[in-house]
Amino acid sequence: MRQGIHPEYQQVLFHDTNADAYFIIGSTIQTKQTREYEGKVYPYVTLDISSASHPFYTGEVRQASNEGRVATFNKRFSRFKR
């Protein structure tokens, strides 16, 4: 393999902010933030969702907050029935 062309593979601290869970995973991601975790300093990346908070993996059932366009239309104009 050629030297100097491959990204640096390192241990990175990922933080799922919804579940407040931390994961140390090998990655080539580049970040300017660092955090100390269990006595070591790691590059730090925040996540909105991971296996610790995703409904598929947690088994939670969530109601979708977005209604379809037809349902929104019907709700808005239901009072104008003939």
UniProtKB/Swiss-Prot annotation:
Q: Which domain of life is it from?
A: Bacteria
Q: InterPro entries of this UniProt entry?
A: Ribosomal_bL28/bL31-like_sf, Ribosomal_bL31, Ribosomal_bL31_B, Ribosomal_bL31_sf
Cite the PANTHER family for this sequence.
Answer: 50S RIBOSOMAL PROTEIN L31, CHLOROPLASTIC (PTHR33280), LARGE RIBOSOMAL SUBUNIT PROTEIN BL31C (PTHR33280:SF1)
The record's keywords, sorted A to Z, are: Ribonucleoprotein, Ribosomal protein
Organism of provenance: Acinetobacter baylyi (strain ATCC 33305 / BD413 / ADP1)
Report if keyword Ribosomal protein is assigned.
yes
User: Which cysteines does the record link by disulfide bonds?
Assistant: none
Instruction: List the GO biological process terms.
Output: translation
Q: What is the lineage of its organism?
A: Bacteria, Pseudomonadati, Pseudomonadota, Gammaproteobacteria, Moraxellales
Record's subunit section: Part of the 50S ribosomal subunit.
Database matches in PROSITE patterns: RIBOSOMAL_L31
Protein name (Swiss-Prot/TrEMBL)? Large ribosomal subunit protein bL31B
Cellular component, GO, one term: ribosome
Xref: Gene3D superfamilies: Ribosomal protein L31
What would be an example GO MF term here?
A: structural constituent of ribosome
Question: Which family does the UniProt entry place this protein in?
Answer: Belongs to the bacterial ribosomal protein bL31 family. Type B subfamily.
